[in-house]
Amino acid sequence: MFRLKELQKKQQQQQQQQQQAAAPATNGTDAVTTEPTDVKRQNSNDLKEIRKQKSKDSYFSLKTKQSSESGSKRANPAELRAQKDIDEMEVPTGCAVSFKDTNDILNFNLSITPTDGLYQSATFQFTINIPSTYPYDPPKVHCDTLVYHPNIDLEGHVCLNILRQDWMPVLNIGTVIFGLMTLFLEPNPDDPLNKDAAQLMIDNKKTFEANVRQSLRGGYISNRQFPKLL
């Protein structure tokens, strides 16, 4: 009887020892199991935070870039005034304005086809450059078409009073275009660049007019051939 109780007691002790031994193992297992989960959760949170920060940095980087680009493309006073002139301009009949580069408003082409006078129906091409000091300084005008004219020399320089001493800041691009058209309608021999043509216009207007017609048909004047425009 005593021996049986002793054996039962030993078995209980062994079971308790096994339970105690198993308890740390279980706790260790939990620690091993839960530790990776906690680390994974922490890593996930860190990753989200990093992504959020990167997204924030990218946004401000983009805004800074846009601001920088906007600043670099800011129009200068000459461009603002030229844009205003063009917006308000009424192009005379027979004139057409074109831009090689739509982003460059300070350089453009002008074609003039007079509707009356000696140069009627011929088309003349001009290049116009607006200086950075505009409107305090006048536009620079070059005639790209070789023409027999008292106020335009054979190199394409144009003699127009408002492009020189008579220029004022209140004048505009439209005024210049109108002035160029007027040169073809009413050539001015009193302020010439082609002095031979101007003198002939004064001395013998009929011969001058004949020379103009001949030049527009691609003929020669003083051993110089002109392009055929009619």
From Swiss-Prot:
GO terms for molecular function: ATP binding; NEDD8 conjugating enzyme activity; NEDD8 transferase activity; ubiquitin-protein transferase activity. Residues 1-87 are annotated as: Disordered. Residues 77-221 form the UBC core domain. It is an enzyme of class 2 (transferase). Pathway: Protein modification; protein neddylation. Keywords: ATP-binding, Nucleotide-binding, Transferase, Ubl conjugation pathway. Residues 26-36, 61-70 have a biased composition (Polar residues). Its EC number is 2.3.2.34. One of its GO terms (cellular component) is nucleus. GO terms for biological process: protein modification process; protein neddylation. It holds the Pfam family UQ_con. Residues 37-57 have a biased composition (Basic and acidic residues). InterPro entries: Ub_conjugating_enzyme (IPR050113), UBQ-conjugat_E2_core (IPR000608), UBQ-conjugating_AS (IPR023313), UBQ-conjugating_enzyme/RWD (IPR016135). PANTHER family: UBIQUITIN-CONJUGATING ENZYME E2. Both the N-terminal docking peptide and the catalytic core domain must bind the uba3-nae1 complex simultaneously for optimal transfer of nedd8. Accepts the ubiquitin-like protein nedd8 from the uba3-nae1 E1 complex and catalyzes its covalent attachment to other proteins. This is NEDD8-conjugating enzyme Ubc12. It comes from Dictyostelium discoideum.
